Every structure is written in C-alpha cells, then in structure tokens.
Amino acid sequence: MTALNVLIYPDDHLKVVCEPVTEVNDAIRKIVDDMFDTMYQEKGIGLAAPQVDILQRIITIDVEGDKQNQFVLINPEILASEGETGIEEGCLSIPGFRALVPRKEKVTVRALDRDGKEFTLDADGLLAICIQHEIDHLNGILFVDYLSPLKRQRIKEKLIKYKKQIAKS
C-alpha cells in the first residue's frame, strides 16, 4: 500500500466532477487501500479520490480513526436527508483552514462497497457530515465554495503562497 499526494486548493483537478466507477476490481481495491493509507498518514477522517488526483467516485471514511469502522463508498448517492446542522469543517486539500458549513443532520446514502456490492447506509452526526463533505468533492465542490468570495479569495492566496514555499523546500 502506498500513500498518495494530496492536491492542495486551488488545484484545478479539485473542481472536476468525477466519473462513476464502472467495475470494482483489484485496481479499484488498490486505490481504496492507498486512499486509506493517505488518509491516516495525513490525519484525516475522510478522503475523496479527486483529492489524490483520481477522478473517480470513490470515498474512504473513518471518523473514529481507529481502523475499526472504515467505510468505502463507491459511486455514492444521497437518497434522503433531514435536519439542519453544521460544524467547522477542515479539509486535507485546504490545510490550516476551517469554516462553518451548513449540512444535513442525517443522510441515507446508497453506494458500492470495496467488493462491488450495493448497500444503503443511514448516517447521522459526524459521519453524515463527512459523507456530505466527501460527496461534494466528487462533484467538484469544496467547503470554501460555501464561503463569501472575499474569504475564498483570501484562502486561495494564502494557499498559493504555501504551495510555493513547499515547492522551494
């Protein structure tokens, strides 16, 4: 298993609407394993494939971070949602920044697991928020897109400087 490079905003690939996975095979399972490795290495609780420059509809989640409650959602689709909530969200692709994002309190999602079997999941709390955040990534939406243009621009400028500093070192 290999940790992958996480793209940093404003990378254009983070704004792409991802293609569905047509077949869950060993190559997809390898991507899933690498995504989990990357997510844990970066201390995240969720990761969407476009964040590691794989433009397919794949999500890995472990809100507990204990590797005991891992979720793989391939081609996820929210079927139902209810309630209103929101927390300050962070993102591995937007390091050092957090913002309050409006989300649904509960979601029902349908997806394929790592073996290609369809399942339905009822989620609430942090898991529901994480699912919504990661599905946004699959649709080319980042949490900064919920912010005012001025706040979004300030974050963009700071991260461009950050990326230049990283490139020099």
Swiss-Prot record:
Binding note for cofactor: Binds 1 Fe(2+) ion.
Catalysed conversion reaction: N-terminal N-formyl-L-methionyl-[peptide] + H2O = N-terminal L-methionyl-[peptide] + formate
Needed co-factor(s): Fe(2+)
Binding site for Fe cation: 91, 133, 137
HAMAP family per the UniProt record, alphabetical: Pep_deformylase
Function, as annotated: Removes the formyl group from the N-terminal Met of newly synthesized proteins. Requires at least a dipeptide for an efficient rate of reaction. N-terminal L-methionine is a prerequisite for activity but the enzyme has broad specificity at other positions.
BP-aspect Gene Ontology terms: co-translational protein modification; translation
Family to which this protein belongs: Belongs to the polypeptide deformylase family.
EC number: 3.5.1.88
GO molecular function: metal ion binding; peptide deformylase activity
The keyword DNA damage is assigned to this record: no
Active-site residue list: 134
Name the record gives this protein: Peptide deformylase
Pfam families found in the cross-reference section: Pep_deformylase
NCBIfam families xrefs: pept_deformyl (TIGR00079), PRK00150.1-3 (NF001159)
Record key words, sorted: Hydrolase, Iron, Metal-binding, Protein biosynthesis
Xref: Gene3D superfamilies: Peptide deformylase
Source organism (scientific name): Haemophilus influenzae (strain 86-028NP)
